[in-house]
Regions:
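Extracellular/periplasmic periplasmic-binding protein-like sensory domains
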Residues: 241-314, 370, 374-381
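Hydrophobic alpha-helical segments within soluble ligand-binding/sensing domains
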Residues: 85, 144-168, 180-182, 212-214, ...
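Segments of small-molecule ligand-sensing domains
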Residues: 300-307, 321-373
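Extracellular/periplasmic bilobed ligand-binding domains
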Residues: 184-280
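Beta-alpha junction/loop-to-helix N-cap segments that form part of ligand/metal-binding clefts
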Residues: 24-28, 32, 47-52, 62-135, ...
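Extracytoplasmic "Venus flytrap"
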Residues: 36-55, 63, 76-83, 105-106, ...
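Short, low-complexity disordered leader/linker segments with a strong preference
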Residues: 1-34, 65-66, 380-382
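An alpha-beta-alpha
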Residues: 141-204, 227, 320
Length: 382
């Protein structure tokens, strides 16, 4: 009898162990689908992360279920730091067991998670990381925004055609892949327009978090360029422009999409009047019926006009849910395959088709600071 009991217990334990092994990496069916979000809620990029998350949360309220299951957002602060971004992505995958990830504002932060999502085979959709390297050779990273070769060309064309600029200086943040990359694409396009490789009279650098730009600005001032291109975080860029005006420089200063933040206006004050930058979307020129709905819902929820990053966050969430619905599954690989086939999805920021690199081909908006506000100038098609 004792031998029989021991044998039965051994069989039960063996079956339990086998069941445990079988469930590892393949959690049981749940009534909840978890989507991870890793955005900078603190640090140098906090304003961008906060705007993006507002759009994601609005989309989740608008569409809280898919395939008859509740969609739960798991939001982790990547603290505007590359190491923290990698840690956040790991946590979402290993601990929270998300089936897809949204993020991140800041190309460097997205790139920090690239190998992680690729190895784990959990798809990520970036809202606004514009550096081409984010999705390069990574079938599990997608984005709903344009990329920097286009953005740099848009601003080079503006400088050359609208401002009549024939010389330019570059002031870049060497710690940000976004800033260095976008500067390069501006230079490529601008020198092609001028036909003169010497039309870039200077390229000077600073580091994220710097507060004093007097050395860089003084060196540029002496060269008297027709325009300055200075893509960087909204905080440093606003300070840079303010100090340029304090030095008596009236050279037009252009930037990229990261300038679209309330803090750019509050830090820069009157000094940033006339600043021109490229971005992804404007509430002044809705492009689809979904844009209209998004703008109304955003205003109702937050009591303010929507911005480009909220719109992109909204679209990233909706694109993932569309992929889940088309896949008929919340399996990560199935979602990735459906994302790769996204074509003609109507979003708040426009019609979204993801190309062979996982990139969206989108128009760009050019805004100008006038009267302490961001004012729409024009839309540029790819």
């Amino acid at each position: 009898m004792k031998k029989t009991l021991v044998l039965m217990l051994s069989v039960v334990m063996a079956l339990s162990l086998l069941a445990g092994c079988g469930s590892r990496g393949a959690p049981a069916e749940s009534d909840v689908i978890k989507i991870g979000v890793f955005e900078p809620m603190t640090g140098a990029n906090a304003a961008g992360g906060e705007m993006t998350v507002e759009g994601i949360q609005l989309a989740n309220e608008k569409m809280p279920e898919i395939l008859g299951k509740k969609v739960e957002l798991v939001i982790v602060d990547n603290k505007s730091d590359k190491v923290e971004a990698a840690n956040a992505a790991n946590k979402l995958i290993e601990q929270d067991k998300v089936v897809a990830i949204i993020g991140s504002y800041g190309s460097s932060l997205s790139m920090a998670a690239g190998d992680i999502v690729k190895t784990a085979q959990v798809p990520a959709v970036g809202c606004s990381p514009t550096n081409p390297l984010v999705t390069l050779n990574n079938d599990f990273y997608f984005r709903v925004c344009f990329i920097d070769p286009f953005q740099g060309t848009v601003m080079a064309n503006y400088a050359f055609n609208e401002l009549g600029a024939r010389t330019a200086a570059i002031i870049q943040d060497v710690q940000q892949d976004y800033s260095v990359g976008l500067s390069k694409y501006f230079v490529d396009a601008f020198t092609e327009l001028t036909g003169d490789p010497n039309s870039i009279v200077a390229t000077v650098s600073y580091n994220t978090g710097d507060q004093d730009f007097s050395a860089q600005l003084t060196s540029v001032k002496g060269l008297n360029p027709d325009v300055i291109f200075a893509p960087g975080n909204y905080g440093e860029s606003a300070l840079l422009i303010k100090q340029a005006r304090d030095l008596g420089m009236d050279t037009p200063i252009l930037g990229g999409d990261t300038w679209e933040a309330p803090e750019f206006l509050s830090i820069g004050g009157a000094a940033v009047e006339g600043a021109v930058f490229s971005t992804h979307f404007t509430s002044e020129a809705p492009v689809t019926e979904v844009s209209e709905v998004f703008l109304a819902d955003y205003q109702a929820k937050y009591g303010k006009a929507a911005n480009a990053f909220a719109a992109l966050g909204y679209d990233a969430y909706m694109v993932i849910l569309d992929a889940i619905e088309r896949a008929g599954s919340a399996d990560s690989v199935a979602i990735q395959q459906a994302l790769a086939e996204t074509e003609g999805f109507v979003g708040a920021t426009g019609n979204i088709t993801l190309d062979e690199n996982g990139d969206a081909v989108k128009s760009a908006v050019i805004n100008k600071v006038e009267g302490g506000k961001f004012v729409y100038l024009t839309t540029v098609e790819p």
